[in-house]
Amino acid sequence: MAAKIRRDDEVIVLTGKDKGKRGKVKNVLSSGKVVVEGINLVKKHQKPVPALNQPGGIVEKEAAIQVSNVAIFNAATSKADRVGFRFEDGKKVRFFKSNGETIK
């Protein structure tokens, strides 16, 4: 099955503590989760690694979020949108369901 959300897509969070926030997808995991820039920040307690010259401490980083909790952001309508697939010139492309516009 083709992925409706891909890396570098701009998405909006639908549920949870970051509801309504927008960000760019950094990574899509095979477990049905995505990592979004600046969304779902968690504090990780990191041990120092002297061999790599990394200091220890509390590091803030993005955690994965379920792909069902995000929707692709349509800049033309400034709203969350759904994704469809169609064939154009023999290639399968994604499009916004609300206005039919092709996604990059």
From Swiss-Prot:
Signal peptide (UniProt feature, chain positions): none
Any single Pfam family the record assigns to this protein: KOW
Gene Ontology terms: biological process: translation
RNA-binding among keywords: yes
GO molecular function, one term: structural constituent of ribosome
The entry's keywords: Ribonucleoprotein, Ribosomal protein, RNA-binding, rRNA-binding
Gene Ontology CC terms, in alphabetical order: ribonucleoprotein complex; ribosome
Domain of life: Bacteria
Family, as annotated: Belongs to the universal ribosomal protein uL24 family.
Reported function: One of two assembly initiator proteins, it binds directly to the 5'-end of the 23S rRNA, where it nucleates assembly of the 50S subunit. One of the proteins that surrounds the polypeptide exit tunnel on the outside of the subunit.
Assembly behavior: Part of the 50S ribosomal subunit.
HAMAP family reported for this sequence: Ribosomal_uL24_B (MF_01326_B)
Protein name in the entry: Large ribosomal subunit protein uL24
Organism the protein comes from: Edwardsiella ictaluri (strain 93-146)
Gene this protein is translated from: rplX
